[in-house]
Curated annotation (Swiss-Prot):
Quaternary structure note: Oligomer (believed to be a pentamer but probably hexamer).
Organism this protein belongs to: Oryza sativa subsp. japonica
Name the UniProt record assigns to this protein: Putative germin-like protein 3-4
Binding, Mn(2+): H116, H118, E123, H165
Subcellular localization(s) per the UniProt record: Secreted, Extracellular space, Apoplast
Main location: secreted
Domain of life: Eukaryota
Length: 229
């Protein structure tokens, strides 16, 4: 009985210690800031994991505010029928070191934000208008499970860091969503463009073997992405 009690006690202590570390494990992907703000000097030649700071005296109030995503772009500007207005550190230097960024995405009817991955951030989004099919694909060890739901205006969704996902406008009118990331530079890997539009190209035999299709199919798909996104 005494041995069993000691075993249970040790287990409880282990769980408590693990929970105490939880905030460290789930904190933002970017490093914590060491000052109130560090407005990115995008012209600096200093190489760091992020951007060097402008002198505080050179940073006006405007670095705290942006109207860039107040309006969207042309949804017919590319074959996907969508337009992404980015608000990461390159577009909003004030978020440098703060571990946040945003995007606005507008969709034509039938438009899509193709399957892609954000390797450095979790994504949280809200649909402002229209209705979007949001799809998320789990990892291989989770059985490649596909999760999806039609998300309507005022509803939200979350994309775990690194998982493949997409959005598709299933409505008859244009749709808009705004998403935020826990990184100033979440990165993006578009799956179709990565496979068939890389620079230099992935060797065709590799894709033929991996996708289990004929050479002609791979060459056709490559021809669709020669101009990029």
């Amino acid at each position: 009985m005494e041995h069993s009690f000691k075993t249970i006690t040790a287990g409880v202590v282990f769980v408590v210690l693990l929970l105490q570390q939880a905030p460290v494990l789930i904190r933002a992907t970017d490093a914590d800031p060491l000052q109130d703000f560090c407005v990115a000097d995008l012209d600096s030649k200093v190489t760091v994991n992020g951007h060097a700071c402008k002198p505080a005296s050179a940073a006006g109030d405007e670095f705290l505010f942006s109207s860039k995503i107040a309006t969207g772009g042309d949804v017919n500007a590319n074959p996907n029928g969508s337009n992404v207005t980015e608000l990461d550190v390159a577009e909003w230097p004030g978020v440098n070191t703060l571990g946040v960024s945003m995007n606005r995405v507008d969709f034509a009817p039938g438009g899509t934000n193709p399957p892609h991955v954000h390797p450095r951030a979790t994504e949280v989004g809200i649909v402002l208008r229209g209705e979007l099919l949001v799809g998320i694909i789990g990892t291989l060890d989770m059985g490649n499970r596909y999760y999806s739901k039609v998300v309507r205006a005022g509803e939200t969704f979350v994309i775990p860091r690194g998982l493949m996902h997409f959005q598709f406008n299933v409505g008859k009118t244009e749709a808009t969503m705004v998403v935020s990331f826990n990184s100033q530079n979440p990165g993006i890997v578009f799956v179709p463009l990565t496979l068939f539009g890389s620079n230099p190209p992935i060797p065709t035999p590799v894709l033929v073997k991996a996708l289990r299709v004929d050479t002609g199919v791979v060459e056709l798909l490559k021809s669709k992405f020669t101009g990029g996104y």
